């Protein structure tokens, strides 16, 4: 016995262990939100009117209260309510009105709590919601409070209900009945102490009575008794329904009562294809139920994550049978789609356990024992309503903490949308939940599936339906794909089956039908044969002008030369005869395609609905044939836009020829072009078109024989524009511009006006109205033309010395007359032009003579341009040679890449103007620029004498190099030394014009060694040096002295090896160089007169023993400054050198060399900082 007891206790421990682990994880979870200081935190006092023993499985506090703790933890995990703490006060109303009033007085009057979560029962909620209105306290509703009365914002302005009201459920039901044409229903509901199912049924009945577009007859309204002892009464109610109705609407509060109903209808034979059972609910569970234990649904669970309500454990043998019966049931409920199924499972398994935790802290025995119980039916609603409140106060606090004391602000902040445990929660402006109902049914896999989405508008009362199926037969899968009828075909008793029509009139119908079918088949066959012949003929004709888009091939693109971005060489010049037309400069208003390897022109038009008349027009357009009318090839209408295809005229449009101005047009050519246009217009006016309606110089093409041809005509609606381009109105007649005529009402006289404007372009050889030289804008000219009158503007006929028949000018003026009736017809114009013909001859011969003259002039012009190009190229080469070394520039000009090149031995020269900052401070910016320009111009001349290369000059700094890019053996050291001495010599004689007392002194540094040089950059390429040799030369300059030439050991060694005794030099001694350590450096003072043959008066003297004569240090003149000495005005301050007799200095402790090194270290660091500051100040001054 003891062993059995131990096994039971161990099994209980194993059952509780997973629950404990998950709970521990929840209670220990932390958020990453920023902690709020204690002074800024606020405690929200929450009052909860709960029930402890009433309706325990539905709304009982021990099985529901944990939802508040779960909601608080969820809010904190999601980053909300960080500045808040919660104090929860719970009082029990037990769904009693009087207790509800007492609790309401305590919460709202005595304690003045911040928010009250109302009782989950209808009667006490009505009392407390009224009190909340009086005391202006926000109140939250959940549970069994679905009555439509709670949506009345005048009575309950401060009530926010998370539950959808049952009246919206009723209207949605009636909408479903209307769609399915079910006009007879039965209403059944579960008996309940709180009358929740009855209140839902009452609202449903109210919706049925108020629905005015579809009448529904409620044949039975009956409560279904509870308890197994009342089966006989239960069966009696179902039998009444069987005799009166097939559509049964039911409301149940709990899953067991739903299962019992399913069991009873199966026993009574009401679970077949004749019956439809519509189950109503507002709990977001559909066909599901709350888990019976603490484990989540593992087997036979629905897609919503819940177990089906017909499944019980252990199985009583009816689970499978009742599952089959459930296929005859539809469920209308709030959406069961919960985005976070994992959190739903966590909530289900932990809601009962956390009720004992703060701030809820329920310590009753029922709460303590609830840890092993599932949450109540409406616990998820309590969770969502508290989560909604937490979101609202967080938003208000973030806006202004004072808003938490404003009841209207709180009320407005509660109007939120979020995804909760009861589905998608949306609170509208009335602080009521927008009901988003779903119609669920079982699919072929016995799984819950949604087939409709019904949304009820609380303002207008309308129900919008969104179908989740494409074929209604999928909804009735278990009914054989057919919708059940409200009244069976054979009546409710099965005795009223009507006699079929076939039985009554079958023989007669078959006889008459056979004759009629034969006659109809004959007529239809004849009709389709005739229609097919007509269609084939029509298709054959239409195929002549219809051009498939795939047959229009774009012309091949011409190859373009690509130049290397590293090459500076000029590309070859391609000079061609400008009289040769190309596709790029000839057809600015057209597109070029190849059709069957022949080039054609096309104009694009927006796609529109073409009618048969348009097709006939295109057929007739193809038949138009005249030497002055361009050939219409066809239309392409199978692309995104329509393309009208015309024959190609290689010379282009008349507008482009005149605009380019690259051809000399003489009077004979002008006359021929005007005559061709008139002949073409005459042909069109006498054709079926009667008018061109789009005539301008851009629609006049010129072919190879210089023959003008009219194009872009007769396209009807394709050519019409609702708002033509302003510039095109320059060719339009005044009556057309005024907009008084529709496109099909344009007369021939309008074309005559356009012809006159084009003629003015031809005669003046300028664009229409000469807009390039006119001060008037297009809008101003169009306005004056539209205004009309005797002084209406017209194009100028300035012939510019060209002799034209005066009668032709008179004819043009007559053609653009203000009155359409005064304009001559095309026939008259052609006759007059014939009489005015200046001479007879071939236009092509005339044009060829003009082209020969033009070619001669072009050759002369090309030769002049070539000379100019050669001169400019020489200038560019000179400029490039100044920017880069000649060898590098030549390689770049030839298109060759300049790779970086290494040099084994070069000499680098750095110089800097001493005290340049002080000099710049005494000068204006322009004087500084002039000073540097004068100085560097002479420096550049000295550089050219010595064959060195100037790399760059920045401010007062100067960088030169010898030994690259052309190698010169070891001569580079001598060239740099000579250059340095000449620089020093020049600076002695250089005078500053505006500062005659000031002198320019240089500090020069020289170093020799290997180096790498190369071109850097594309837009402004520069020849740059890289390597430690350059850095060391810069250090030689920065560590040098004014008017001294400072050599590194490498340069000195090279100089002495290849040019010994040619220069007076001296060792400076060991100097600490930044980045290099201790280095021995040298001075160069002057040329040696014995070997160079040139006297030197430089006056330089050595601090150390001279290397050319071996003199001792005692022989150094006293005027030679010591190594550590600095100018008096130098910003560097030095301590006074200690006396040789000082007791702190001994021959062993401090040597003269070490003393000089110490002073040089101090000098180097301070002088380097000072030089950097001086350069920045100089650049700022410039």
UniProtKB/Swiss-Prot annotation:
Membrane-protein topology: Single-pass type I membrane protein
Residue ranges constituting the Guanylate cyclase domain according to the UniProt record: 907-1037
Broadest EC class assigned to this enzyme: lyase
Disordered, as annotated region: 1094-1164
Domain Protein kinase: 562-849
Gene3D superfamilies, per database record: 3.40.50.2300, 6.10.250.780, Nucleotide cyclase (3.30.70.1230), Transferase(Phosphotransferase) domain 1 (1.10.510.10)
Residue ranges annotated as Cytoplasmic topological domain: 529-1182
Compositionally biased residues, Low complexity: 1142-1152
Sugar attachment sites: 91, 369, 430, 453
GTP-binding keyword on record: yes
Cleavable signal peptide: 1-24
Cell compartments where the protein resides: Cell membrane
Ion transport in keyword set: no
UniProt-listed GO biological process terms: cGMP biosynthetic process; intracellular signal transduction; receptor guanylyl cyclase signaling pathway
PROSITE patterns: GUANYLATE_CYCLASE_1, GUANYLATE_CYCLASE_2, PROTEIN_KINASE_DOM
MF term (GO), any: guanylate cyclase activity
Entry EC number(s): 4.6.1.2
Expressing tissues: Expressed in IL2 sensory neurons.
Cross-referenced InterPro entries: A/G_cyclase, A/G_cyclase_CS, ANF_lig-bd_rcpt, Cyclic_nucleotide_synthase, Kinase-like_dom_sf, Nucleotide_cyclase, Peripla_BP_I, Prot_kinase_dom
UniProtKB keywords: Cell membrane, cGMP biosynthesis, Glycoprotein, GTP-binding, Lyase, Membrane, Nucleotide-binding, Receptor, Signal, Transmembrane, Transmembrane helix
Listed transmembrane segments: 508-528
Gene Ontology CC terms, in alphabetical order: plasma membrane
Domain writeup: The protein kinase domain is predicted to be catalytically inactive.
Recorded family membership: Belongs to the adenylyl cyclase class-4/guanylyl cyclase family.
Function statement: Guanylate cyclase involved in the production of the second messenger cGMP.
Name of the protein: Receptor-type guanylate cyclase gcy-19
Gene of this entry: gcy-19
């Amino acid at each position: 016995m003891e062993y059995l007891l131990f096994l039971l206790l161990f099994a209980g421990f194993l059952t509780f262990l997973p629950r404990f682990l998950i709970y521990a994880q929840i209670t220990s979870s932390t958020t990453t939100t920023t902690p709020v200081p204690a002074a800024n935190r606020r405690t929200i006092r929450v009052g909860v009117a709960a029930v402890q023993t009433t309706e325990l499985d539905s709304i009982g506090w021990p099985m529901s209260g944990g939802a508040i703790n779960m909601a608080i933890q969820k809010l904190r995990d999601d980053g909300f309510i960080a500045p808040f703490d919660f104090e929860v006060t719970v009082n029990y109303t037990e769904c009693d009105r009087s207790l509800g009033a007492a609790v309401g007085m305590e919460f709202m009057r005595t304690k003045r709590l911040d928010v009250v979560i109302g009782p989950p029962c209808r009667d006490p909620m009505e009392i407390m919601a009224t009190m909340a209105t009086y005391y202006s306290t926000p109140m939250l509703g959940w549970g069994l409070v679905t009555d439509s009365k709670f949506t009345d914002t005048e009575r309950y302005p401060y009530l926010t209900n998370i539950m959808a009201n049952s009246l919206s459920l009723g209207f949605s039901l009636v909408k479903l009945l209307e769609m399915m044409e079910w006009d007879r229903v039965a209403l059944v509901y579960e008996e309940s102490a709180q009358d929740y199912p009855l209140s839902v049924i009452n609202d449903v009945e109210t919706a049925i009575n108020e629905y005015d577009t579809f009448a529904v007859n409620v044949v039975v309204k009956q409560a279904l008794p509870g308890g197994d002892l009342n089966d006989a009464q239960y069966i009696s109610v179902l039998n009444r329904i069987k005799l009166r109705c097939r559509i049964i609407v039911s409301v149940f509060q709990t899953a067991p009562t739903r299962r019992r109903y399913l069991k009873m209808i199966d026993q009574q034979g009401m679970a077949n294809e004749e019956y439809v059972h519509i189950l109503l609910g507002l709990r977001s569970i559909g066909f599901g139920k709350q888990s019976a234990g603490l484990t989540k649904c593992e087997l036979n669970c629905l897609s919503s994550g819940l177990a089906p309500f017909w499944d019980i454990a252990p199985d009583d043998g009816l689970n499978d049978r009742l599952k089959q019966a459930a296929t005859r049931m539809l469920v209308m409920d709030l959406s069961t789609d919960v985005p976070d199924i994992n959190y739903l499972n966590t909530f289900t398994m932990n809601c009962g356990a956390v009720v004992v935790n703060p701030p809820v802290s329920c310590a009753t025995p029922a709460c303590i024992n609830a840890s092993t119980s599932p949450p109540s039916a409406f616990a998820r609603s309590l969770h969502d309503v508290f989560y909604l409140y937490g979101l609202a106060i967080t938003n208000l606090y973030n806006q202004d903490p004072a808003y938490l004391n404003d009841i209207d602000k709180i009320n407005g902040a509660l109007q939120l949308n979020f995804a909760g445990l009861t589905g998608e929660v949306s609170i509208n402006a009335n602080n009521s939940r927008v009901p988003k109902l779903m119609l669920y049914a079982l699919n072929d896999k016995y799984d819950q599936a949604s087939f409709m989405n019904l949304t009820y508008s609380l303002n207008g009362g309308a129900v919008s339906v969104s179908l989740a199926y494409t074929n209604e037969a999928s909804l009735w899968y278990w009914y054989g794909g057919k919708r059940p009828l409200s009244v069976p075909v054979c009546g409710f008793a099965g005795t009223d089956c009507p006699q079929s029509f076939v039985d009554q009139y079958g023989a007669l119908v078959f006889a008459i039908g056979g004759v009629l079918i034969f006659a109809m088949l004959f007529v239809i066959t004849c009709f389709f044969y005739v229609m097919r012949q007509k269609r084939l003929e029509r298709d054959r004709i239409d195929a002549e002008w219809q051009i498939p888009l795939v047959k229009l091939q774009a012309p091949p693109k011409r190859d373009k030369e690509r130049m290397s971005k590293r090459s500076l060489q000029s590309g070859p010049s391609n000079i061609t005869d400008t009289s040769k037309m190309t596709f790029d400069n000839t057809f600015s208003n057209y597109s070029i395609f190849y059709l069957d390897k022949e080039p054609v022109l096309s104009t694009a038009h927006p796609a529109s609905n073409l009618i048969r008349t348009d097709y006939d027009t295109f057929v007739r357009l193809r038949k138009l044939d005249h030497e002055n009318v361009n050939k219409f090839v066809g239309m392409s209408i199978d692309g995104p836009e329509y393309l009208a295809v015309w024959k190609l005229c290689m010379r282009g449009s008349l507008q482009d020829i005149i605009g380019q101005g690259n051809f000399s047009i003489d009077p004979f050519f002008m006359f021929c072009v005007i005559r061709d246009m008139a002949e073409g217009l005459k042909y069109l006016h006498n054709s079926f078109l009667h008018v061109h309606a789009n005539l301008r110089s851009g629609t006049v093409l010129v072919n190879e024989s210089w023959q003008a041809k009219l194009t872009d005509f007769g396209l009807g609606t394709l050519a019409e524009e609702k708002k033509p381009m302003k510039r095109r109105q320059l060719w339009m007649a005044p009556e057309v511009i005024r907009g008084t005529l529709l496109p099909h009402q344009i007369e021939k006289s309008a074309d005559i006006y356009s012809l006159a404007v084009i003629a003015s372009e031809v005669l003046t050889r300028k664009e229409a109205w000469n807009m390039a030289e006119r001060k008037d804008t297009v809008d101003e000219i169009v306005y004056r033309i539209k205004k009309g009158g005797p002084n209406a503007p017209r194009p100028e006929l300035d012939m510019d010395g060209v002799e034209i028949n005066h009668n032709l000018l008179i004819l043009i003026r007559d053609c653009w007359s203000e009155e359409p009736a005064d304009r001559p017809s095309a026939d008259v114009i052609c006759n007059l032009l014939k009489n005015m013909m200046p001479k007879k001859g071939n236009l092509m011969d005339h044009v060829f003579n003009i082209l020969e003259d033009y070619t001669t002039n072009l050759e002369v012009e090309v030769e002049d341009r070539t000379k100019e190009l050669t001169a400019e190229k020489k200038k560019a080469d000179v400029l490039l040679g100044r920017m880069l070394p000649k060898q590098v520039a030549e390689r770049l000009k030839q298109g060759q890449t300049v790779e970086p090149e290494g040099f084994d031995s070069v000499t680098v020269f750095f110089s800097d103007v001493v005290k340049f900052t002080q000099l710049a401070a005494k000068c204006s910016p322009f004087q500084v620029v002039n000073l540097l320009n004068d100085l560097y111009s002479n420096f550049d001349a000295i550089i050219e004498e010595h064959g060195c290369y100037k790399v760059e000059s920045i401010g007062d700094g100067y960088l030169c190099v010898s030994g690259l890019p052309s190698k010169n053996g070891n001569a580079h050291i001598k060239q740099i030394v000579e250059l340095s001495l000449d620089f020093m010599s020049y600076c002695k004689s250089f005078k500053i014009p505006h500062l005659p007392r000031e002198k320019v002194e240089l500090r020069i540094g020289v170093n020799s060694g290997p180096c790498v040089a190369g071109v850097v950059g594309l837009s402004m390429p520069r020849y740059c040096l890289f390597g430690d040799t350059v850095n060391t030369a810069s250090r030689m300059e920065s560590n040098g002295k004014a008017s001294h030439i400072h050599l590194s050991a490498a340069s000195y060694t090279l100089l002495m090896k290849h040019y010994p005794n040619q220069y007076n030099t001296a060792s400076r001694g060991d100097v600490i160089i930044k980045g290099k350590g201790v280095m021995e450096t040298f001075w160069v003072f002057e040329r040696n007169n014995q070997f160079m043959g040139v006297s030197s008066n430089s006056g330089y003297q050595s601090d150390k023993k001279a290397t050319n004569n071996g003199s001792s240090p005692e022989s150094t003149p006293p005027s030679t400054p010591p190594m550590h000495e600095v100018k008096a005005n130098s910003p560097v301050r030095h301590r006074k050198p200690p006396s040789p007799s000082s007791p702190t200095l001994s021959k062993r402790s401090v040597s003269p060399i070490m003393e000089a090194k110490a002073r040089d270290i101090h000098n180097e660091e301070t002088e380097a900082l000072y030089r950097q500051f001086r350069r920045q100040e100089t650049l700022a001054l410039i």
